[in-house]
Each structure stands twice: as C-alpha cells, then as structure tokens.
UniProtKB/Swiss-Prot annotation:
It is a multi-pass membrane protein. It comes from Brucella melitensis biotype 1 (strain ATCC 23456 / CCUG 17765 / NCTC 10094 / 16M). Belongs to the CobD/CbiB family. This is Cobalamin biosynthesis protein CobD. The chain crosses the membrane at residues 61-78, 80-102, 160-182, 300-322. HAMAP family: CobD_CbiB. GO terms for cellular component: plasma membrane. Signal peptide: none annotated.
Amino acid sequence: MEIKLIVLSLALLLDRFIGDLPLLWQRISHPVVLLGKAISWGEKNFNDSSLPPSTLRRNGMWLTVGLVAACIFAGLVIRSILPHAGTAGAIAEVVIVAILLAQKSLADHVQAVAQALRDDGIEGGRKAVSMIVGRNPDRLDEGGVSRAAIESLAENASDGIVAPAFWFLVGGLPGLFAYKFINTADSMIGHLNDRYRDFGRFAAKLDDVANYIPARLTGLLAALATSLGHGREAGRQALSIMCRDARLHRSPNAGWPEAAFAGALGLALAGPRQYGAETVEGPMLNATGKREAEARDIDAALVLFWSTMSLMTGLVIAASLVGLFVG
C-alpha cells in the first residue's frame, strides 16, 4: 500500500501541473479513446434493436463483463512487467496513473466555459459547455450554461479524479483500468433512452456500484475544503445540504458532490435538463440557492475544485509519508 500511495501522490502532482499533452494524443490514441472504440465495436455488433429486451440486456452484460476482464488482465500483465524495468518501470507506473486522472484537463475545459461567456457571450458559452455536457446547449441561458459547467465539474471531480485514485489504491493498475472502462462504458451506453435502455443497463448499474464510495468521499472532501477555506459554518452548510439533498438527484452518486458544491457555493444546481429533444425532470439541489449563475460562479467553483483536489493530494501524501516512516 505504501508504494501505491507514493505512486498516486506523484501521479496527482504530475496530472495537476502538466495534465494531458495534446500533441502526444494527436499522434497516438489516448487509452480512454481505445476503450471507447472497444465499446463502440461491441455496441455496433451486439445492440440490435430487433432483438428482445432480455437478449439486449444479456448482450450488454457479457460485453461489459468481458471487456472489464480484459482490462483487469491488461493491468495484471503491465503490473507484472514494470518491476523488472527498475526505475523506468516506477516512472512508467506514475505516468500511466497520471494519464488516467483528469484534474487539469477538467479544470481547463470548465475554465474555457467561463472565459467564453466573458469573451463571446451566451453563444460562446453554449459552444464551450457542449464540450463537457451531453445536454442540449441551445436551450440554456447564461445561468443554465454556468450551472451545467459547475455540475459537470462537481460530478467529474468524483468520476475523473477521486474514483480513479480510489480504485488504484484498492486494486492497483488492474483496479484503475477496470474502473476507467466501467465509467467510459456508462458515459457511452448507460443512457435511459430507447437505444441504450436495455443494452447499457448492466454497465450503468456497475458504474453506480463503482462510484458509490468515491462520490460520497468527493462530497465530504468538498465540504471539508470549504470549512478549511471559509470557516466551519460554511463547511457545515455544505455538509448539511449534501446530506439533505444528495438523494434528490436522479443519479444515486452524482448528487453527493453536486449537492456539496451547491451548498458551498450558495447555488441551486441540477433540476430539469434537456437532452436533445427530451426533457428529463428533476428537483433542484439547494433549491433556495442562487439560480442565475454566471461566469464568476464558475470561477468560484474552480477555486473549490482545486481546494478539494489539494486536500485529497495532501492526505495521500501524508498517508504515504506515514507509511514510509512507520513501515
């Protein structure tokens, strides 16, 4: 465990200060892109709308199980090879973990929404937010664009950073690879529409299980970061609203970080959402909070995000140091 804590500490720092390298991923496929291609292949070959729902559910389940097993196997193979490479192997493991985290890339995409609202108005904001959310941006006003960016930031703080870190600590590279596949599968086929309702059902449920603990950890970290940055009362407010409203969210997990961010920022988040021509109803989190969010609220959310990430990184580093000295 001490080694995994050290690797994760270095990976979190590398991802924070360097992040993704666009020039590299223009030349070779990012691992998540490869996962997406595998899912697309399976969906194309096994999600036939002429099949009965029970067959589609079974096809989706076996595709997901098979590809999760392949990811675990790949992780086991790489984990067995790296120790034989000495220092280069240790560096490679840090880089692999960093590649599968998303602190800087997530923050950059969300910051781009705030900047677009300032520079290009609502049309610029809609275009920028469409890069990070699946909902229909054409129906969003400035408040809707800003809330969508903040909601995506809160949810992906869990899905993109805390959860991968958690599963790496639990299962090493095999656990990390398996989680990234599950989360990617959920984002691609775990939708409640006619095309994916049956085929993606298993992937969606598996993602709910995989994110159960990380989502709640993310909310707690955000509330604690709020307390450290703005005082106990602000932290208690974030924690209280999280505990009160998280279960109102249509997702069993996304509501925890989103409600914590809503309470910390004094915003009303979630509520009805437009996906294409379909409206998905849902209650607001922190319904008495401010609804007319704007670019400066995105800025405040980014400050909270980085405070939360700093707290998590600090805890991981502290745990690794304790392990070194005690062990």
